[in-house]
Amino acid sequence: MKLKLFFLFILFFSTLAFAQREYARLDNDRGTSMEPILARAEPLIEEIEEDDFEIVRMEFDIISTEKVTYRKLYKDWTYGIVAFGDYRIKDIDVAVYEKVRGKWELFEKDAENDDEAMVSIKPYKDGEHKIEISVFKYNKDYYVGHYGLLILHE
């Protein structure tokens, strides 16, 4: 499973890096359109579904520094969690936390310096997980952008 996820994400990220600049032209004059981030997500969604993965959560929103979301994950599954930014975002990260004795502890993170982040996790137990999306750097003249978050498994 991890190997399959690895190859899926390699294909996904190479496609996104090549096409990122093209998505800027889809935005409106005010820079508020969701079209660029949705266009960026489309090839990934198609690839995920062609490879028989199931998307169990999709989220698209505006972000300046960080957003947090929660999801119950199950120990019987290995999950891929992908966060990606639109043309304005230069560095986005994702971190997954598990609740241990009432406190959130870091389970896995991707802190690479690029506009997409991915982790593959297999929870130790069924339970709620905290997913934190953080933006550390924007492209010149931007301080806000849209992000996409996808959670998937086989």
Summary of predicted features, one role per range:
Residues 1-22:
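Bacterial Sec-dependent N-terminal signal peptides
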Residues 20-49, 125-154:
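C-terminal edge strands of extracellular/lumenal beta-sandwich accessory domains
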Residues 52-74, 119:
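Non-catalytic, beta-strand-enriched accessory regions in extracellular/secretory proteins
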Residues 60-61, 108-113:
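Short beta-strand segments within Ig-like beta-sandwich modules, predominantly Fibronectin type-III
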Residues 71, 113-125, 136:
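Beta-sandwich interaction modules
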Residues 85-92, 139-141:
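Extended, low-complexity, turn-rich repeat/linker tracts enriched in Gly/Pro/Ser/Thr and Asp/Glu
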